[in-house]
């Protein structure tokens, strides 16, 4: 089953959960906001430490239909990946579509990202 490859998951909508459980520094949230590459990277690193897994990923974004701004429009999604070597990689994408479409595209991109990184590292 999935327990062979998934150690766990955490939904960290609130900044409080991000800081308490994932050890995202409050300074990062204050300076960059919850939807940022800095936050996504810190979330992935914290998830790896928290879970003792080989890999961790994070997704933070604005799926809509509201909540966007000119700097961070609806569809803005930041990703973080952290692997066994401790290196954190981040990326931002802007997806189009409704809330469900943005969520589906985000999940697909995050999983493709971790799979590609895991295969590359093992090569």
Model-identified regions with their sequence ranges:
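Short alpha-helical segments enriched in small residues
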Residues: 1-123
